[in-house]
Amino acid sequence: MKIISKSTVLIAIISPLFVTVVIAGESVKVDSIEVYSPTALPSIGLPIKDVPYAVQTATGEEIREQPGVSIADYMVNNLEGVTVNEVGGNPYQLEINYRGYNATPLVGNPQGLSIYVDGVRQNMPFSNNVLWDTIPDFAIDNMQLVGGSNPVYGLNTLGGSLSMQTKSGRTFNKSAIEVQTGSWGRKIGLIESGGVSED
């Protein structure tokens, strides 16, 4: 059996500190790298007319002018290939079906649509279900429904992707107050304001 002395252990502990100091003392200049991705998202800048697959678009004004409770109401009435199932009895938690592929809040149902808000995937990590009531439909600036399977949109994008962008101070440079009432005592009040500072 080999016995390790205290000085050997001390040298083994202290030696990485000297290496780190030497590495930290050197300055390295790295060139910038630009990465481009060919998706139909307007934030990236590729025109929708140049995309080689079906893309349906809607603006926030079109969505808000449509009678209904949620964004699903607009989609079923205005976008081709979209149907809605009310499986949970909640108008804010609908199962959206696009060409046979679902985006549903129910765990266990097969999913095939990827949902993005401002480039952040809204499908839950393990079940891929979508909690539609967490998406603020009043804050949507524009929306694109992209058909077909595309690996650019991530795992489980079998039938398509729904990409939404929300308002910002640059796109919504005003203030607005909105009040809605409906059946069964439903009341909704919204106040929104946006703008960009000159500073």
Regions found by a protein language model. Give the residues of each.
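Non-catalytic regulatory/gating segments with a bias toward low-complexity or hydrophobic composition
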Residues: V55, I63, M75-V76, N142-L145, ...
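Hydrophobic, lipid-facing positions within transmembrane beta-strands of outer-membrane proteins
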Residues: L94, Q111, G160, N173, ...
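Periplasmic plug
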Residues: G88, Q93-G147
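A beta-strand signature from Gram-negative outer-membrane beta-barrel systems
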Residues: Q122, D133-E178
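Residues that define the transmembrane beta-barrel architecture of outer-membrane proteins
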Residues: N156-L158, Q180, G185-G189
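Short, acidic, small-residue-rich periplasmic hinge/interaction motif at the N-terminus
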Residues: A24-R64
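Outer-membrane beta-barrel architecture
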Residues: N97, S163, E192-G194
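Short, glycine-/polar-rich solvent-exposed loops and beta-turns at beta-strand/coil boundaries
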Residues: E26-V28, N77, G81-E95, L155-L158
